[in-house]
Amino acid sequence: GAYLALAGVALLSMAVLAFITFPAAPAKQANGEGRPLREIMRQPVFMVAAACGALGFGVMNLLMAATPLAMQQCSLPFSDVALVLEWHVIGMFAPGFFTGHLIKRFGVLPIMGVGVLLNAACIVIALSGVDLHQFLIALFLLGVGWNFLFTGSTTLSLQTYTPAEKDRAQGALNFFVFATTALSSFASGVLVTTQGWQLLNAGSLIPVALTGAALVWLKTRPQAVPAQSL
């Protein structure tokens, strides 16, 4: 049943994509291949986009992957685990229908800041107890926070490279993001079983705080961010 449902979703996606007209790829710059990757990565906007994308994704994956083990330790049934993860996934992807509009209206940095606050709220709720409703609300907020941070960091990074530099810049950004995600996957099970759910969440406040600090730092450097992004 589950595989048939996935096949149906895949077919629906193909049908939707068949009616989308994608813009033609811009021509390469005539004056060469653009700046070296090191120069692109040294830009404050790129550094903040990479840091927020990596830390936001890492925290989300760390807590999400640890949640089933933590709920099992709390003797909650598998049906509750499934419900929590379902709402977490809804929180991750449902905002995608309007996150772009929010960024256009309010700016990318404020939306990313809301993502940081949602992650912090998730941790506070998770630290308040281990009942079903606390897991449910915390993981839903974590999903929405991830959406705002990941979409925002991707949008922010678009300002840091030209079409000729796109492949290298996006490759570097994805490396930072998904290397951090992989590390968090390896660490989550070990940390939740050896340190516990409460300490895992308390420790997650550190990367959340670093993400917020990076946004504040960039905000204090308005010359590094175009006006429409503030």
Mark where each language-model region is:
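A membrane-interface helix-boundary motif in multi-pass transporters
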Residues: 1-8, 190-208
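C-terminal membrane-cytosol helix-exit motif in multi-pass small-molecule transporters
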Residues: 5-27, 214-219
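Juxtamembrane intracellular "pre-TM" segments in multi-pass secondary transporters
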Residues: 22-49
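Pair of pore-lining "gating" transmembrane helices in MFS-fold secondary transporters
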Residues: 42-60, 140
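Helix-to-loop junctions at the C-terminal end of transmembrane segments
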Residues: 94-108, 192
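Structural signature of the two symmetry-related core transmembrane helices
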Residues: 110-124, 205
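Intracellular juxtamembrane helix-capping segments at the cytosolic ends
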Residues: 148-161
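A late C-terminal transmembrane helix in Major Facilitator Superfamily
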Residues: 164-195
